[in-house]
Amino acid sequence: MKKIVSILMCLLALKSFSQDTDQKFIIITTDGLRWHEVFKGMDSLIAIDPRFNQDDSLGLFKKYWSSNLLQRKALLMPFFWSTIQSQGQLYGNRNLGSKADNANPYWFSYPGYSELLTAQADTSINSNDFPPNPYENVLEHFNKKSNYKNRVAAFGSWNAFDRILNEKRSGFPIINAFDDNKIALDQPDMKLIHQMIMTGFRPFGNSEILDVFTHYQAFTYLKTQKPKAFYISYGDTDEWAHHGEYKFYLEAIHQFDAWIKEIWEYVQSDPFYKDRTTLLITTDHGRGDLKKENWTSHGQSIPDAHETWFAFIGPNVKPLGEMK
């Protein structure tokens, strides 16, 4: 029987952790990453299309292509298809009958993140400009528990997370985009990263920073402040897709995989986190594929943009690999 799984189910699974004072979790998202690249690697039809390959089709095929599916997806996401495949679970390969979908009917970012983080697919949340979220999010839920209080934080590339997570109400630090980061600034690395964010080039304008800054802010915070419930949201995948730049989109996916590896290897090497930390990795929405040119887009006008995926790895996750 084919299974249709909502990312809401992932959130419900996490809530049971609060009964165990030793358990930690990290939710990691990357915006608008298609399941097609996760489970099938580089799409050759997009990579040969001069509208999208940035005049480097040869380079893309040299770096990311193999006619063997297992090799091809491992070239793009080596950590996913080694460690997570052997030690965790991956959902969303529709070719195997594993279907992960948005529960909301809109298929863009604010509604997608809201349902993921609050377990509420409220149709009134229908705009990326929606005001502060009325629903309690999972991080807020944990921050109310005595064993997690003040050990919760979130970092995001996009400036909407202070609204999605309702920073004024939630009671934990939420650092997104060009926020004036006042947390952990006693750390020299944090000061330098913040200075680079504020003075560097802004390819995505004033609403979003490059993921490299988000990652190293979050990773520094993880190592120095030791949060027990943590969220990191990356955005380069969506930005480069909207720009129609498939080379940069693939590079962003490859880098995302490398950063997850870095996070996992760190938590498995640190006594505070080792064998007590679960990673949930997912996305907020899908993108088009029925018409290849729609890979750049999502939303209600794109009929397959509701198709998502997710992965788990952690001490209480059975090593079942790619789910069918």
Question: What are the residue ranges of the model-derived segments?
Answer:
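Active-site-proximal alpha/beta segments of enzymes that process anionic O-linked groups
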Residues: 22, 40, 44, 65-224
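Structural recognition of the beta-strand scaffold that forms the well-ordered cores
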Residues: 25-29, 36-37, 91-94, 115-117, ...
